[in-house]
Amino acid sequence: MAGSSRIGFMAIAVAFHLVYILSIFDIYFVSPIVTGMKLFGVERPHESPKAPADRLVLFVGDGLRADKAFQAHPEPYPESDQDLVPRHLAPYLRSRVLEHGTFGVSHTRVPTESRPGHVALIAGLYEDVSAVATGWKMNPVNFDSVFNRSRHTWSWGSPDILPMFQHGAVPGRVDAFAYGAELEDFSKDATELDYWVFDHVKDFFAAAATNETLNTALREDKVVFFLHLLGLDTTGHSYRPYSKEYLHNIKVVDQGVKEIVELIERFYGDDRTAFVFTADHGMSDWGSHGDGHPNNTRTPLISWGSGVAAPELHPGSIAPGHDELSSDWNLDHVRRHDVAQADVAALMSYLIGTEFPANGVGQLPLNFLSASIKEKAEASLANAQVILEQYRVKEENKRNVELRYQPYGQLSDGNLDPESRISHIRSLIEAGSFEEAIEESDALMSIGLQGLRYLQTYDWLFLRALITIGYLGWMAYATTTVLSLYVVKESMSPQRTLLGSAFFLSLLVALYSSFIISKSPPAYYLYAFFPVLFWEEVYARRANVAKGFQALFGHVKSGGAVVALVFNVVLYLGVIQSLALAYIHREILTGLFVLGAFWPMTQGISFLRSHLFLSMLWFFSCLAMSTFTLLPAMKVEDIPLIMAGGGLMTFVGLAYLVLEDFILSDVSSSKTKLKRLHTSRTLLGIQVGLIILAMLVTHSSATSLQAKLGLPKGNQIVGWFVLVTSLLMPLAYRLQPNSHYMHRLAIIFLTCAPTFVILTISYEGLFYVAFSITLLSWVRLEYAVDAFTQEKAKKQATVAGSQQHTPSTFRPLSLSDARIALFFMVLLQSAFFSTGNIASISSFSLESVSRLIPVFDPFSQGALLILKIIIPFFLISANLGVLNKRLGVAPSAIFMVVLTASDVLTLYFFWVVKDEGSWLEIGSTITHFAIASFLCVFVAALEFVSAAFIAGIEVEDTKSAALTSASTKADEKVPPVAGAE
C-alpha cells in the first residue's frame, strides 16, 4: 500500500481528511431546495380580486441591530448641551411603530451573513450553511423568490446582493441598479452608499414623469421596489455599532426612508403601497457578524401601509411580546410581534397578492395583516399548502431511491395524510370556523416542517456510523504505519489471507450496491472506501502492530512502571480533552501553559542546576503565553499595543545582531565570521529595518484611517513593499549561506515580523514574540532533557553490548516522544486560539487589511487574514523540524504521531455536533469540527514546510558531534549534555 512510505502516508492523510470534511456537507449542509412543486397563493373572490396592496417597498438596512434601531442615544455629533440628552435617532421609523403599522423583531439563523439573510427575507427559505461561501460574489439565487413571483421588481444597492436575485429570476423581471465596487471603501464615509441609493431612487421616479413606458410599468400591480442599504454594515465593521459613525448612519437611513416613502406616496397618491423595513443580520459589539450571537440574529422589522395592521396599543400597561431586549425602547405599550426571518417573504407575497415562493418555509405572520378572520384563515391554508407540497415532492424523490422507505409517521396514516387534512381545513372555513381553521393550518404547517426535517435528516444515522468507523479506521491505520516505520526495527510484510480479503471486498461491494440503488452522491463511495481500506490494512499488518506494542511497552513490567504508564496515559488524554474544551473556553490554554511552565522541575534538581537559564526562560515564556488567552478574543484597534509589539520584534532582532557571534561561535570559522559581518549582518540589518518601516507606515495608516482621511496612496504602496520584500528576504541569504539552526530560526522570525506588524490590530505582535521565544526554549529544553536522560541512562546501564547507532541513522520512537507530540499539539492549538476564537476569525476586524486594501475585496482581504493566521504555524513547523534533527528522530515521525492523535479531537467534535438548540450552539459545533479537520490536513502540510525550512541546517557543535559518534545505547542515539543549550 502507498501509505507504507512517508510520502504515501501524508498523501493519504490529506486525501482522507479533505474527503471526510465533505461529510459535514452531506449530513448537515444538504440543500433544502427541490423543484417540481405546484404554486399556491391566496384565492380571492371575484367580487374583490385585488390584493391588499398594489406594490411593496422593501428597505433592508444591512447590518442593523434591533436594539440600536429602537434605543435612545445622544446626538452622535453634538453641537450643544441639549444634544447630549438621549433621543431616538430614527424618529420616522419610530412613528410608523407608534401610529401606522406593526413592529417586532425578526430572528435570523446562522450564518448571519448577507446572502443567507437576503435569501431568507426574499425567498423564504434558509439556505444550507455552506451558502455563505457563495455570498461574496455573484451566484444566482436559482430558486423561487418574491421578486420572481412579482410582475416586476426594481432594486438599488450593492453589487454583491442585487445581481444574484436578478440573474436567478425570470429574464427581464428584475432590474438591478448597483454602484461600483470601488465605492465600498472602508476608509471612507459609508453613508455615501446609502445616499447613492436614495438619490438614484429619486432620479428613477423623476424619469417616470417623462418616460411613458416606465410610468405605465410602475403603475401595474404586484410591483416590488427593493432598497439595499449597505452603509450600516460597512460602518459597523469599521467603527463598531456603538460608535458615533454607526449611530449617525441610523439617522441617515431614517431620513432617507422618510423621503422615499413621501416620494412614492406623492407619485401614486392612492394609498395602495405597503412598506417593510428590516435587516439581513445584526452586528456584534466588535463590528462582526456571522455567528449566532443574539446581537447578530435579532433585527428590526417594521411594516406599514396598505394591508398592514395598525399598532396594537395597551395604554398604561406592558403590551404582550416584550422582554428584556426591548425594556429600554420606550415601546412597552405597543405590542411586539416577533417573527422568523423567512416569515417576511410570506408576508410580502400576501401583501401584493402573488403566489408564495415555491421553496418558502416561512409562516405568514397573521398579526401583521389588516384582514378579516376569514381572509386570514384562507391565507394560512395557502401557506400550509406550500409547505406540504414541498414535503410531497421530497418524499416522492426519497421513496424512489430507497429500498425500504420509512415515511414520516404523522403524515402517513390514512386519516392524517396531507390531502385529508387540507380538506378538513377547507370544510372548517366553509362552515365559518375560522379560528379553528387557522389553528389546524398552523398545526399542519408545524407537522409539514417536521416532515421536511425528517426527510432532510433521513440518512443521518447511517452516515454518522460510517464516518465514525472511518475515523477510527484512520487512527488505527495511522498507528500501524507509525509502528511499522518508526518503532519496529524490521517491519514484516503484510499478511493477507483469502478469507480476510474476501470479507473486506464483500463488505465494500455490499455498500456500493446500496449506494447505486439509492442513487447516492459520489462522495458516499469514498466515505465507504476509506474505512474498508484502513481496516483491511490494519488486519494485514497485525504482526507489526504486535511487535510495535512489544517494543514500546515490553519494558513495562513492574507494578510501579504500570502505574506510571497509566498515569501518563490518563494525563495525556486529559490534556487532549482540555484542548477540545479550549475551542469553547480559551482560558483552558492558560491553565495548560501554567502547568507546562513547571515541566523542567520534573527532571530533578540536578537538571535544573545544569540548565537554570534555559529552565527560567521556558518558565517565564510559558507564563507570558498564558496571559493571551485571558485577553479578549474580539479586539479593537490599539495603536500603542501594535507599536509595543513591533518594538519588541525590533529589540529581538537587534539583540541577535549584537550577540550573533556569541550564539554561533561554536560552529563558525574565522573566515566565515568575517564574511558574515559583511553579508549576513547586512541582510539581518535590512530585516530589522523593515520592521521599523512597517511600524512607521502602520502608525501613519492607522492614524489616517481613524481620522477618516482615507488611506494615503503612498502608505499603501510602502505597506505592500514592506510586506512583499520581507517575505522574499530569505532568498537573499543564498549570497552567504549560514547553516546554523539558530541563524535559520532568526531569519524566519525576522521574515514574518513585518507582516505581523502591518496586519495586527492589538496584542498579536506581543503574542508573536512570546510564541517565538517559547518555541525556541522548547526546542532547546527538549534536547537538553533528552541528552540529560540518555547520559543518566548510560551511566546506569549494566548491559555493555548495546547496539550501535551512527549519527546518520534515525533512532526509533520511544514512549518519551509522546510528550513532544503532546507539546506540539498544545502549541498548535495556541497558535490559533491565543489571539482569537471562532467568531473573531469568521468575522475578522477590517482595520488591519484596510491598511493594504481599503476597498471591499473579500477574497484578497481573506487571503491576508489567512497569511496572518498561518505564520505561527510556520514557526511551529520550523522549530519542530529543528528538534527532530537534534534528537535524531526521522523528519516525519512526530508529525505522524500528532496527525494520529489530533483526530481524537476531530472525532470528538464530530460526535458533539448539534442539529438542535440555539443557532449559536449548532453553528459553533459544526465550525469546531471543520477547524479540527483542517488542522489535521494542515499538520500534514506543515511536515513539508518544515522540511523546506530546515533543509541543510546544522544542529550540533563540533564537540557534540564527536561525542555523539562515539556514544552507544540500545535503540537510541545518545546526544551529549554539552551543547544542550
UniProtKB/Swiss-Prot annotation:
PANTHER family: GPI ETHANOLAMINE PHOSPHATE TRANSFERASE 1, PHOSPHATIDYLINOSITOL GLYCAN, CLASS N. The gene is MCD4. The keyword Transmembrane helix applies. Belongs to the PIGG/PIGN/PIGO family. PIGN subfamily. The keyword Cell membrane does not apply. It comes from Gibberella zeae (strain ATCC MYA-4620 / CBS 123657 / FGSC 9075 / NRRL 31084 / PH-1). Pathway: Glycolipid biosynthesis; glycosylphosphatidylinositol-anchor biosynthesis. Residues 1-6, 486-496, 541-560, 609-611, 660-681, 730-744, 841-862, 914-929 are cytoplasmic. It is found in: Endoplasmic reticulum membrane. This is GPI ethanolamine phosphate transferase 1. Its main location: endoplasmic reticulum. Residues 28-464, 518-519, 582-587, 633-638, 703-708, 768-819, 884-892, 951-981 are lumenal. InterPro entries: Alkaline_phosphatase_core_sf, GPI_EtnP_transferase_1, GPI_EtnP_transferase_1_C, Phosphodiest/P_Trfase, PIGN_N. GO terms for molecular function: mannose-ethanolamine phosphotransferase activity. Coiled coil: none annotated. Gene3D superfamilies: Alkaline Phosphatase, subunit A (3.40.720.10). GO terms for cellular component: endoplasmic reticulum membrane.
